[in-house]
Amino acid sequence: MKAITVLSGGLDSTVVTLIAKDLGYEVTAITFNYGQRAAKREINSAKKICEILGIEHIVVDLPFVKQFGKSSLITEKEIPTLKMEELDSEKAYETMKAVWVPARNVIMFGIASGFAEALDAEKIFIGINKEEGVTFPDNTIEFVEAFNKVLEYGTLNKVKIEAPLYDKTKEEIVKLGAELEKKLGVEVLKYSYSCYHDNGEDFLHCGKCESCMRRKRAFLMAGVEDKTKYIE
């Protein structure tokens, strides 16, 4: 029983990888380098997590994505910051548009599907969630269902994408992650990387970007100790 996880090194994909591991799958994690600012830190976080969990790790380079320009994640455009109380406001939608990378999930999930078919994996686990689904249309269960329809025709082994966190908030994801860490006897959440920036040191977060603020709020609301290193 084999599975692929799309592991960005972030909180959600780390918990999804824990879920796949807990379900007994032989897991291969894939991390994508598409020229994002934090690529080095994300890859190093994913590598550390895979080492702890004893799973195979594949890094796929997608240099052409930078040609899309536009997104603050792959250009020198300023990345917006948000206060915690603004995370559920209209301003969060504007921030989403600033960091949106054209067709990113379409590209990554398509490539992950190719690896899944080649490795005889039946499932691809991804970390889309309720909170980000509000602003990112490719973080919704509707997107997953539509993509799975494509995979019925695009793969011979009918590989299927699983999104076990699609209806969960970040708070619930942190709680679940902490429970799975305890169950599996591992500690990986503190090595996950959510920040949009490369802050010059592995696992070090800026503490100001939208992604960092969502991470901070999640741990705070979950009542789980946040062992993340923040600059602010």
From Swiss-Prot:
Matches recorded under InterPro entries: QueC, Rossmann-like_a/b/a_fold
Tell me the cofactors it needs: Zn(2+)
Q: Which organism is it from?
A: Methanocaldococcus jannaschii (strain ATCC 43067 / DSM 2661 / JAL-1 / JCM 10045 / NBRC 100440) (Methanococcus jannaschii)
List the Pfam families: QueC
- Cite the EC number: 6.3.4.20
Q: State which gene encodes it.
A: queC
The reactions it catalyses are: 7-carboxy-7-deazaguanine + NH4(+) + ATP = 7-cyano-7-deazaguanine + ADP + phosphate + H2O + H(+)
What job does this protein perform?
Answer: Catalyzes the ATP-dependent conversion of 7-carboxy-7-deazaguanine (CDG) to 7-cyano-7-deazaguanine (preQ(0)).
Protein name stated in the entry: 7-cyano-7-deazaguanine synthase
Q: How is the cofactor bound?
A: Binds 1 zinc ion per subunit.
**PANTHER family xrefs:** 7-CYANO-7-DEAZAGUANINE SYNTHASE (PTHR42914:SF1)
Domain of life of the native organism: Archaea
